[in-house]
């Protein structure tokens, strides 16, 4: 029981749009009916029926160009998998916000930010191009 591996030094069959005529036929070992059809192929092609021509094509090629160009539904799997992982990530983030992170510091409150901004304006921080340059100290409001 010796397993014989395929010899990869020989040309292999492949269906590709950019390589339309592979070096070898799709069917390597012909049956008796296929051998008879190959003999009939050597005669005039007008004597062959449409089914025989299709069978000869299928011996040489696995897929036609129309079958190779047919759209696959693989995009649905990709989008579904991406959405699944986005959902898992959203659940993890929600769990972390609820159970891992503490409350926000007081410096994030709107009142605190307003007091800090007022303090910076009173100190005239960065009066040339910064915050203080945009405040009108005479009218006590932001410049327009």
Curated annotation (Swiss-Prot):
Write down the InterPro entries for this protein, in alphabetical order. Answer: Cyt_c_oxidase_su4, Cyt_c_oxidase_su4_fam, Cyt_c_oxidase_su4_sf
Residue numbers bearing the N6-succinyllysine modification: 4, 35
Q: Which domain of life is it from?
A: Eukaryota
Q: Transmembrane ranges? A: 74-99
Residues on Mitochondrial matrix side: 1-73
Q: Which GO terms describe its cellular component?
A: mitochondrial inner membrane; respiratory chain complex IV
CDD domains attached to this UniProt entry = Cyt_c_Oxidase_IV
Which compartment or compartments is the protein found in? Mitochondrion inner membrane
Q: Name one Pfam family in it.
A: COX4
Pathway annotation from the record: Energy metabolism; oxidative phosphorylation
Which key words tag this protein in UniProt?
A: Acetylation, Membrane, Mitochondrion, Mitochondrion inner membrane, Phosphoprotein, Transmembrane, Transmembrane helix
* Membrane-side (Mitochondrial intermembrane) residue stretches: 100-144
Q: Which residues are annotated with the PTM N6-acetyllysine?
A: 4, 28, 35, 42
Residue list for modification Phosphoserine: 31, 33
Membrane topology category: Single-pass membrane protein
* Annotated GO biological process: mitochondrial electron transport, cytochrome c to oxygen
What is this protein for, i.e. what is its function?
Answer: Component of the cytochrome c oxidase, the last enzyme in the mitochondrial electron transport chain which drives oxidative phosphorylation. The respiratory chain contains 3 multisubunit complexes succinate dehydrogenase (complex II, CII), ubiquinol-cytochrome c oxidoreductase (cytochrome b-c1 complex, complex III, CIII) and cytochrome c oxidase (complex IV, CIV), that cooperate to transfer electrons derived from NADH and succinate to molecular oxygen, creating an electrochemical gradient over the inner membrane that drives transmembrane transport and the ATP synthase.
**Family of the protein in this entry:** Belongs to the cytochrome c oxidase IV family.
**What is known about its subunit structure?**
Component of the cytochrome c oxidase (complex IV, CIV), a multisubunit enzyme composed of 14 subunits. The complex is composed of a catalytic core of 3 subunits MT-CO1, MT-CO2 and MT-CO3, encoded in the mitochondrial DNA, and 11 supernumerary subunits COX4I, COX5A, COX5B, COX6A, COX6B, COX6C, COX7A, COX7B, COX7C, COX8 and NDUFA4, which are encoded in the nuclear genome.
| Name of this protein | Cytochrome c oxidase subunit 4 isoform 1, mitochondrial
Whichever gene encodes this chain, its name is COX4I1
């Amino acid at each position: 029981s010796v397993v014989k591996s395929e010899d990869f030094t020989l040309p292999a069959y492949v269906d590709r749009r950019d390589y339309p005529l592979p070096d070898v036929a799709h069917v390597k070992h012909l049956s008796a009916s296929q051998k008879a059809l190959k003999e009939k192929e050597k005669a005039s092609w007008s004597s062959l029926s449409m089914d025989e021509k299709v069978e000869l094509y299928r011996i040489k090629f696995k897929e036609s160009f129309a079958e190779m160009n047919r759209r696959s539904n693989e995009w649905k799997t990709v989008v579904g998998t991406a959405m699944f992982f986005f959902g898992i990530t959203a659940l993890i983030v929600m769990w972390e916000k609820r159970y891992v992170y503490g409350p926000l510091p007081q410096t994030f409150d709107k009142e605190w930010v307003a007091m800090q901004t007022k303090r910076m304006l009173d100190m005239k921080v960065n009066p040339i191009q910064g915050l203080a340059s945009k405040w009108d100290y005479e009218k006590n409001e932001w410049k327009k």
